[in-house]
Curated annotation (Swiss-Prot):
It comes from Mycoplasmoides gallisepticum (strain R(low / passage 15 / clone 2)). One of the primary rRNA binding proteins, it binds specifically to the 5'-end of 16S ribosomal RNA. GO terms for cellular component: cytosolic small ribosomal subunit. InterPro entries: NA-bd_OB-fold, Ribosomal_uS17, Ribosomal_uS17_bact/chlr, Ribosomal_uS17_CS. Keywords: Ribonucleoprotein, Ribosomal protein, RNA-binding, rRNA-binding. Part of the 30S ribosomal subunit. The keyword Chloroplast does not apply. GO terms for molecular function: rRNA binding; structural constituent of ribosome. The keyword rRNA-binding applies. One of its GO terms (biological process) is translation. Belongs to the universal ribosomal protein uS17 family. This is Small ribosomal subunit protein uS17.
Length: 85
């Protein structure tokens, strides 16, 4: 069942909270009438473990859906794909 969870890729835009990061996920959709590519984005609060494995601002991360961890957190960082330079 663990593999049936939603997985998204995004960029960490804030890590100022304890054990929480804000990740911006962009999605590209085609407009139904004009057929133009429309880029939309959404921000998620994700669980970010402290220590060496913690994601920093600018990191490209893979986030996975999980049980509710707080009032706004339902995602956790599954993997850090690329570190910020």
């Amino acid at each position: 069942m663990r593999n049936s969870r939603k997985v998204l890729m995004g960029v960490v835009v804030s890590d100022k909270m304890q054990k929480t990061a804000t990740v911006k996920v962009e999605s590209k959709n085609r407009h139904p009438f004009y057929h133009k590519l429309v880029i939309s984005h959404k921000k998620y609060h994700v669980h970010n473990e402290e220590g060496e494995n913690a994601a920093k601002v600018g990191d490209k991360v893979l986030i996975m859906e999980t049980r509710p961890l707080s009032a706004t957190k339902r995602w956790r960082i599954a993997k850090i794909i690329e570190r910020a330079k």
